[in-house]
Amino acid sequence: MKFQGPLACLLLALCLGSGEAGPLQSGEESTGTNIGEALGHGLGDALSEGVGKAIGKEAGGAAGSKVSEALGQGTREAVGTGVRQVPGFGVADALGNRVGEAAHALGNTGHEIGRQAEDVIRHGADAVRGSWQGVPGHNGAWETSGGHGIFGSQGGLGGQGQGNPGGLGTPWVHGYPGNSAGSFGMNPQGAPWGQGGNGGPPNFGTNTQGAVAQPGYGSVRASNQNEGCTNPPPSGSGGGSSNSGGGSGSQSGSSGSGSNGDNNNGSSSGGSSSGSSSGGSSGGSSGGSSGNSGGSRGDSGSESSWGSSTGSSSGNHGGSGGGNGHKPGCEKPGNEARGSGESGIQNSETSPGMFNFDTFWKNFKSKLGFINWDAINKNQVPPPSTRALLYFSRLWEDFKQNTPFLNWKAIIEGADASSLQKRAGRDDQNYNYNQHAYPTAYGGKYSVKTPAKGGVSPSSSASRVQPGLLQWVKFW
């Protein structure tokens, strides 16, 4: 190694110096200490220079300082012990042997330390390189300068070279120039935590590609900006006319670099959060599915996934066959079955009209089947039997007794008068129930007219009530 030359020079100087100062036993301890310090400083400087060239100036200085400290302490102890154990004549020879053994041991130790330092440096370089490549398993502080993952824990959500291309900050930034996502190194199609590129506001509305409106769409737009109620064609094979997939080949997630955990961002291979890959998927996973549609607020057919792919069933109310869903507020009758290739016939019911009495009367008669409706319609109702008349007459009397607050006398007399007039069939006949005399046109005499045949006598209220009551109360 590079410190072998300075080490040999130091050993030679020590051996020569030790021979001259050998007989002085009183300086044994100080001599050992001085020799140890010299050896320690020399080895430390050599190691500092070698390690500094290997791993850089700052790291080399730190490592060299530690190694110098350790070697200085060990060398002082070893040389001091050897000097104290061999006093008197021949100190130079013994000291030379001891120093030689110590130097050999230190050489082996330095070689081992160098090998371990080289391994550490190599592992550190690999870790640094892996952090910029989105290695899934790395943790630690090697990725704090704008890597592609949350310190490497999720494997680089945006893949190599797509996230934070111009920044050095932490993954929680609000968007660097040139990156509209702003966080996690996502693709320029936007990410859930981004705030829009170049300071743009979050776009929570419909993006220009017909996919889920996510924060981060402030700066990236597609080529076909059709956001109106355009009713795109049913088939999604080949793009379509509106919101049918955006430009092919746009940056829509890394290829094979891991995903966001729940495919909520379209970061796996082949998919996108906005359906921008040609023939891509509707919800982030490769191959196309009707899942979460790139982080939408609902499943397939939700209000926010509006035609997010060019060949899948995301956001299609009518089933598979095209990713052109319907924008809320723009749906028209007949659009429900367009995606599945059907004719789109409106399947709505007729609005109910006015009240139909004929239908109601038919339903009512059907529920009362025990009544002979034909006889009633033909006015062929048989007269009630005597037993029925007596039964209902008794009920009527009980009802009148239970309702004394009604003037039944006036009610019954008025009913009798009307019923008697109908039965007599004479409009010119005058009934006098109060027994008053009316003047006639002949000579001014007063006459009392009697009721016609079938009438009731005004003197008997009981005989007057029953026939009129039964005639007034009808049971059909």
Swiss-Prot record:
The keyword Glycoprotein applies. O-glycosylated. Residues 153-169, 193-202, 236-259, 268-298, 316-326 have a biased composition (Gly residues). Residues 1-21 form the signal peptide. It comes from the Eukaryota. Homooligomer. Seems to be able to homodimerize and homotrimerize. This is Dermokine. One of its GO terms (biological process) is cornified envelope assembly. Belongs to the dermokine family. One of its GO terms (cellular component) is extracellular space. Disulfide bonds: none annotated. Residues 299-315 have a biased composition (Low complexity). It is found in: Secreted. Expressed in epidermis; in the spinous and granular layers and in placenta. Also found in the epithelia of the small intestine, macrophages of the lung and endothelial cells of the lung. Isoform 15 is expressed in epidermis and placenta. Isoform 1 is expressed in epidermis. Residues 153-351 are annotated as: Disordered. CDD domains: dermokine (cd21118). Keywords: Glycoprotein, Secreted, Signal. InterPro entries: Dermokine. The keyword Glycoprotein applies. It comes from Homo sapiens. May act as a soluble regulator of keratinocyte differentiation. The gene is DMKN. Its main location: secreted.
